[in-house]
């Protein structure tokens, strides 16, 4: 008598941080966070949940925040690292510090910090005032 038992096989993805690039953080083109790392993606044939045979291996850039990933090679990784390490030109209005003006102070004093405006807080009610009556119609 022949007994047919199905063998559950599937393809499993295994993500490993590439040890050569473990300190590299790049900017994600989708979410603009600096959370992209270089991973080694191994697709393997698995029996139930145990990986048995590796089928495919590649290097990928993967964002841990939004899940975006892109297959790359070593030359592309080095190119992106150089591009992100370039200094960005500063805007003149962003580099100039603006100080708050206080009446009666000298204009030559430059170590005055900016003061944030305080939110409007209404004065407290007197305890003898009753709250407004509610109307039921």
Swiss-Prot record:
Domain of life: Eukaryota
Biased composition (Pro residues): 119-137
Ranges for region Disordered: 79-137
Signal sequence extent: none
Comp. bias regions, Basic and acidic residues: 79-93
UniProt similarity note: Belongs to the UPF0768 family.
Protein name, per record: UPF0768 protein C1952.04c
Organism of origin: Schizosaccharomyces pombe (strain 972 / ATCC 24843)
Taxonomic classification: Eukaryota, Fungi, Dikarya, Ascomycota, Taphrinomycotina
